[in-house]
Amino acid sequence: MSGDFDLPSPYVHRVAAADFDVDAYGHVNNSVYLRWLDEAAWAHSSALGVTPQHCVGVRRGMVVWRSQLHYLAPAFAGDALEVGTWLVFSDGRLRVDRRFQLRRAGDRRTLLRALIHYVCADLDSGRPKRMPADYAARYAPLAEVVNALADDRNRGFAPGVEPREPRAISRGATARDDAGDPR
């Protein structure tokens, strides 16, 4: 993997894999990666002025609607890691999307890529609610990120964090029937 992050101008949050992050398989448990992404999202949001205290004050918060994570390589206890995150979409009303790239700081190997979709919710009811105007302004993606994403699409590059939906094997079909389908 390249030593560069996938997109320009990432917000970089640094984490270290601890002994208690390691599971019975001897590597960092996949649920820990999700915790690190959440920490990075909060750190980035706070840097943009959308702190937890601000969210509580206006009774609105961005909550996870859907997560797509591609685990590419394991992390181990003692690894110094960098979580790059970017705002890649905002409709200015309800939805914000973030991309993430987790890499080992030493060799810059990418361990995970993710796309997480958020919706703005009323903190009292938990129901979707239009985001405040300041959220819309603060969560707007950077122009250079939008341009890089457009360049990727123009070259026919799919970002690669959205795995193809697994196809269910229909009743009576065998795995071989499905595996041979070029879909």
Q: Predicted segment positions?
A:
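Active-site helix/loop of acyl-thioester processing domains in fatty-acid/polyketide metabolism
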Residues: 33-56
